[in-house]
């Protein structure tokens, strides 16, 4: 099936501008154009955009996504892409775990300070 950019945008929940931007950044390769220059997208582009959205939710940057696209473009197989994706996901998971530890410490500090302030308030009465 083929889609014009507006149809594709509606289907994947992105703006037309975002789709064009991803194309400019090289995340959408080989987009076909009609004689008038109008872009035409396929189901492969739908899958690619959903994959990009998933990677974005998981915390990957556009530069990291471009790196994966470059690997795929160079080798035309996922054999090199998937191990690198696992490395990136592992790194992001470590970052999330560090942030969770920091947030847990902050939560404990807020709780302790709130108790301190509550005691001071009770003493003042």
Where are these regions (language model features)?
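Glycine-centered, phosphate/nucleic-acid-interacting loop/turn motifs that mediate DNA/RNA or nucleotide
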Residues: 26
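Short glycine/proline-centered loop/turn elements that form peptide/ligand docking sites
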Residues: 1, 5-8, 15-18, 35
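Generic secretory/membrane-interface signal
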Residues: 17, 39, 86-87
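Beta-hairpin "wing" of winged helix-turn-helix
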Residues: 29-36
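Arg/Lys-rich, alpha-helical DNA-contact motif
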Residues: 4-10, 29, 43-125
């Amino acid at each position: 099936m083929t889609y014009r950019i507006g149809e594709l945008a509606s289907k994947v929940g992105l703006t037309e501008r975002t789709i064009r931007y991803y194309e400019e950044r090289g995340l959408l390769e080989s987009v076909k154009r009609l004689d008038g220059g109008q872009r035409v997208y396929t189901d492969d582009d739908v899958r690619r955009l959903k994959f990009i959205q998933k990677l974005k939710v998981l915390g990957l940057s556009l530069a990291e996504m471009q790196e994966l696209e470059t690997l795929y473009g160079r080798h035309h197989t996922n054999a090199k892409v998937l191990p690198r994706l696992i490395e990136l996901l592992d790194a992001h998971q470590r970052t999330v775990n560090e942030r969770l530890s920091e947030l847990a410490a902050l939560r404990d500090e807020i709780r302790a300070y709130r108790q301190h302030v509550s005691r001071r308030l009770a003493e003042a009465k």
